[in-house]
UniProtKB/Swiss-Prot annotation:
Family note: Belongs to the EPSP synthase family. MurA subfamily.
Record: residues binding phosphoenolpyruvate: K22, N23
Keyword Aminoacyl-tRNA synthetase among UniProt keywords: no
GO cellular component, one term: cytoplasm
Positions of post-translational 2-(S-cysteinyl)pyruvic acid O-phosphothioketal modification: C116
CDD domains associated with the record: UdpNAET
Protein name according to UniProt: UDP-N-acetylglucosamine 1-carboxyvinyltransferase
SUPFAM superfamilies found in the cross-reference section: EPT/RTPC-like (SSF55205)
GO BP term, pick one: UDP-N-acetylgalactosamine biosynthetic process
Pathway: Cell wall biogenesis; peptidoglycan biosynthesis
HAMAP family: MurA
Length: 418
């Protein structure tokens, strides 16, 4: 298994680019199942979860052609409407094929999703929504089996809690359903809007994406489309924290500043100089001692749960006490123990973490437990005295493309070893 070896203490300086969004590309790839026509996606990051989804689509019957960051897909027919455990055990986004498969072929058999072990990610919201649209669903032997031999029909679906993948899955199912579907308490994330824009290009009738109520008028069939994936706001945010925690001068390019607005606000409150040189760039400059600032994760446009671990690493270097509250997922503080091995003072109390700083971090051997936790360990290592070895970096490869090369390009002393 690969490891990262990082020697800290170097302020990051220069320009670092942002890739397309993994969390936007995954549902866009799944959307190709909804049509027999070609779908071309640009700016698709070459990360592990994407490659897993592409292999799954090939198994289902999609022709997948990859050329750099462009992926061309065509699903002339559904050969096997199944997502087997062997393929999807490492990826929670496997549930995104459930809606498209039932909508297009009338049946689906999807293994319960894997991915990060960060508590309950309730697929029951997907199941409830599909049942409202008329699907018959059984859960057996770790699989969800759904059938709708007469097709899906429009309905009002009210989500008990906001769910991004659930909103995306139901939106894809509803575009081919008979009649009108209303999704209430829908997720407002930029990735949901990006998927809606792709589906509209394919011929879907969708209104309200980006609000809490999405209206979908079903159509007989969808056509092909060409679409560019939006910038990855989580990768951009990770790099902004990297610049701030090292006291550097880092410009993050090819991003959408509005999508990292909640993080930028917290960075500014903490004493970081943040500017926006252009519509697609954000610059961070360290100004000396950081101030502790409390933070609570929320659905968009609030502070993203996927940036909570990175923010916690930053707060280990801030003056005072910061309370970090995790409202989205349970059991998402596994990085705290590893940061503590490096010298951080963090106390966990249920859904909140109390971070006292500043503490000098020192290099240590640490283990990545999930995708975003691994990013926080990289950030801690960048500011730590001495050498840090991070094991199980396959977690970070699920969502970041060549992060070590990007960070090395702005001065970080980081290398990958087998």
């Amino acid at each position: 298994m690969d490891k990262f070896v990082i020697t800290g203490g170097v302020p990051l300086k220069g320009t670092i680019p942002t890739n397309g969004s993994k969390n936007s590309a995954l549902p866009a790839l799944a959307a190709a199942l909804l049509t027999a026509e070609p779908v071309t996606l640009h700016r698709v990051p070459r990360v592990r979860d994407i490659r897993t989804m592409e292999r799954l689509l090939v198994d289902i019957g999609t022709t997948v052609d990859v050329e750099g960051e462009t992926v061309r897909l065509r699903t002339e027919r559904i050969v096997s409407p199944e997502a087997p455990y062997e393929l999807v055990k490492t990826m929670r986004a496997s549930s995104l094929v459930l809606g498209p498969l039932v909508a297009r072929s009338g049946r689906a058999r999807v293994s319960l999703p894997g991915g990060c072990a960060i508590g309950a990610r309730p697929i029951n919201l997907h199941i409830f929504g599909l049942e409202q649209l008329g699907a018959k669903i059984n859960q057996t032997h770790g699989y969800i089996e759904a059938v709708a031999p007469d097709g899906l029909r429009g309905a009002v679906v009210h989500f008990d809690r906001i769910t991004v993948t659930g909103t995306e899955d139901l939106m894809m199912a509803a575009v081919l359903a008979k009649g009108e579907t209303l999704l209430r308490n829908a997720a407002r994330e930029p990735e949901v809007v990006d998927l809606a824009e792709l589906l509209i290009k394919m011929g879907a009738k969708i209104e309200g994406a980006g609000t809490s109520t999405i209206r979908i008028q079903g159509v007989e069939s969808l056509g092909g489309a060409v679409h560019a994936i939006i910038a990855d706001r989580i990768e951009a945010g990770t790099f902004l924290v990297a610049g701030a925690i090292t006291g550097g001068d880092l410009t993050v390019t090819d991003c959408i500043p509005e999508h990292v607005g909640a993080l930028v606000s917290k960075l500014q409150q903490a004493g970081v100089d943040v500017t926006q040189p252009s519509e697609t760039t954000v610059r961070v400059r360290g100004t000396g001692r950081l101030r502790s600032v409390d933070m609570t994760t929320e659905e968009y446009p609030g502070f993203a749960t996927d940036l909570q671990a990175q923010y916690m690493a930053l707060m280990t270097q801030a003056e005072g006490i910061a309370v970090v509250i995790e409202n989205i997922f349970e059991n998402r503080f596994m990085h705290a123990q590893e940061l503590a091995r490096m010298g951080a003072n963090i106390r966990i109390d249920g859904r909140q973490a109390i971070v006292a700083g500043p503490r000098e971090l020192t290099g240590a051997g640490v283990i990545a437990s999930d995708l975003r936790a691994s990013a926080s360990l990289v950030l801690g290592a960048l500011v730590a005295r001495g050498e840090t070895v991070i094991d199980r970096v396959y977690h970070i490869d699920r969502g970041y493309e060549k992060i070590e090369a990007k960070l090395a390009g702005v001065g970080a002393k980081i290398r990958r070893v087998e």
